[in-house]
């Protein structure tokens, strides 16, 4: 049963993370989603565009300011804010001055410190790509410990490229050799949570199979053969404000869509005492049958 927060209705903030898988080629899908769902803050991954190719004007026309780190053909992350300009705090994950990949950015938005990340995939493993993934994860763990103790309300949002538990995958059999499912990857995620970070989806939907990614191959979307690899982690200062969480799966059903769907949370503007309450159906994101989603 989902958790909701009691008390009077207050101003709320909707924050989402979305691996857009090419911002130029899928700009129309992004703008459609922004117009329909109207999130206040958005973390984007896999822009696959240099800074000069970032669609700043189109997003500004849609009502969103942005900070971003681009990279030609690969990676790239951005933070969007509705009717505001995010204030960039950090560009790049600390710990390796030689790492120039566009995978991490931090910004101050609406009283929050928002960190947007695109963790390395790590395939094939074993090998140098998997070694880089684990080294990057270690750097994230060290930096996250600093953020946890900063006193600020912090969210670590993005594509983590890790499947935390077997509940987060349709079937482990086909993924046993994949970097996303390796014990070392899962252990890094567990260590991150052990610092006191709250996995938003699991905090509110502890027993439900919720996916954020469906591979393009073998009709994974049509068969709902998904993974949950896009996560929004809240530090101890911010977690008490969590109200609801879900996935906008309708976006994945659009022709030519990214293989990810936007994952979102709603925050109160002040902490609320948690009470158990049956949530309205709209608060639990369910994937519509593929034949309807593609209509």
Report residues per predicted region:
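Internal catalytic-core helix/loop-beta-alpha segment
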Residues: 134-146
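Active-site-proximal beta-strand elements of phosphoester/diester hydrolases
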Residues: 12-21, 111-126, 157
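Catalytic metal-binding/acid-base residues of hydrolase active sites
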Residues: 21, 48, 94, 120, ...
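Active-site beta-strand/loop signature of hydrolases that rely on acidic residues for catalysis
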Residues: 15-19, 34-52, 114, 143-166, ...
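Surface-exposed cleft-lining segments at the edges of enzyme active sites
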Residues: 94-95, 120-137, 173-178
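Metal-dependent phosphoester-hydrolase catalytic domains
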Residues: 36, 51-53, 85, 89-96, ...
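N-terminal, active-site-proximal structural segment of metallo-dependent hydrolase catalytic domains
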Residues: 2-61, 74-77, 272-295
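Structured beta-strand-rich core segments of catalytic domains in phosphoester-bond hydrolases
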Residues: 47-50, 54-124
């Amino acid at each position: 049963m989902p958790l909701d927060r009691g008390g009077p209705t207050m101003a709320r903030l909707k924050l989402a993370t979305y691996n857009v898988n090419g911002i130029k080629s899928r700009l129309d899908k992004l703008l459609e989603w922004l117009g329909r769902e109207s999130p206040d803050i958005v973390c984007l991954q896999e822009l696959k565009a240099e800074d000069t190719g970032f669609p700043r004007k189109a997003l500004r026309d849609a009502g969103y300011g942005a900070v971003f780190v681009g990279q030609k053909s690969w990676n790239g992350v951005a933070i969007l804010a509705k009717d505001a300009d995010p204030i960039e705090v950090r560009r790049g994950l600390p710990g390796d001055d030689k790492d120039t990949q566009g995978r991490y950015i931090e910004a101050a938005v609406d009283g929050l410190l928002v960190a947007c990340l695109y963790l390395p995939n790590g395939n094939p493993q074993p090998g140098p790509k998997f070694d880089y993934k684990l080294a990057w994860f270690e750097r994230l763990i060290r930096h996250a410990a600093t953020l946890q103790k900063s006193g600020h309300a912090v969210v670590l949002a993005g594509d983590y490229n890790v499947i935390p538990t077997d509940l987060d995958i349709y079937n482990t059999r086909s993924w046993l050799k994949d970097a996303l499912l390796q014990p070392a990857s899962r252990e890094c995620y567990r260590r991150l949570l052990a610092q006191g970070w709250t996995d938003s989806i699991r905090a509110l939907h502890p027993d439900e199979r919720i996916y954020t990614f469906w591979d393009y191959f073998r009709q994974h979307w049509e068969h709902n053969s998904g993974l949950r690899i896009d996560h929004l982690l809240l530090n101890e200062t911010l977690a008490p404000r969590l109200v609801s969480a879900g996935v906008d799966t309708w976006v994945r059903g659009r022709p030519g869509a990214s293989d990810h769907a936007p994952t979102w949370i709603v925050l109160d503007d002040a902490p609320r005492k948690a009470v158990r309450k049956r949530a309205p159906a709209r608060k639990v994101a369910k994937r519509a049958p593929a034949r309807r989603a593609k209509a």
